[in-house]
Amino acid sequence: MDIAIQHPWFKRALGPFYPSRLFDQFFGEGLFEYDLLPFLSSTISPYYRQSLFRTVLDSGISEVRSDRDKFVIFLDVKHFSPEDLTVKVQEDFVEIHGKHNERQDDHGYISREFHRRYRLPSNVDQSALSCSLSADGMLTFSGPKVPSGMDAGHSERAIPVSREEKPSSAPSS
């Protein structure tokens, strides 16, 4: 049984019809047509704001799954190469850091950096952790769980990011 753990603020009571501008801010992504023509969305209601209707795989949102046999983290890092990513395990936490220096794109210069930290369950076998980056930019961090009586082994170490040639098989929510 897979359990999808997501941040609670993404589960809105009214779904995509809830007028929220704070969570619809995607810095460095460019403007959409309705951003330039706000009167089109205000003809419906002055309080209505069109949602961006982005999927989990398209918005940079991470997904954590923990079932009886394994622990998996899916993270969209499509703007980063494996050389730009650092994955470390320190005690009960996995830290994923991505940074690429300033480079030129169609609109000028851009640089990106993120830092995510996740708590590992106590029964994850830290000696068997793996991390891979799919062709479509989905980082998958996974590790098997051990029975509760066995030692999971806690230490600090870096996890290498391997490159996969096929797209991710992560489910979109």
UniProtKB/Swiss-Prot annotation:
Note down the stretches annotated as region Disordered. 144-173
> Which keywords does the record carry?
Acetylation, Chaperone, Cytoplasm, Eye lens protein, Glycoprotein, Metal-binding, Methylation, Nucleus, Phosphoprotein, Zinc
Q: Which residues are glycosylated?
A: 162
Question: Which domain of life does the UniProt lineage start with?
Answer: Eukaryota
Carries keyword Chaperone? yes
The UniProt annotation places Zn(2+) 3 binding at 154
Where is this chain compositionally biased, Basic and acidic residues type?
Answer: 153-167
This molecule's function is given as: Contributes to the transparency and refractive index of the lens. Acts as a chaperone, preventing aggregation of various proteins under a wide range of stress conditions. Required for the correct formation of lens intermediate filaments as part of a complex composed of BFSP1, BFSP2 and CRYAA.
| Family the UniProt entry places it in | Belongs to the small heat shock protein (HSP20) family.
Q: What is this protein called?
A: Alpha-crystallin A chain
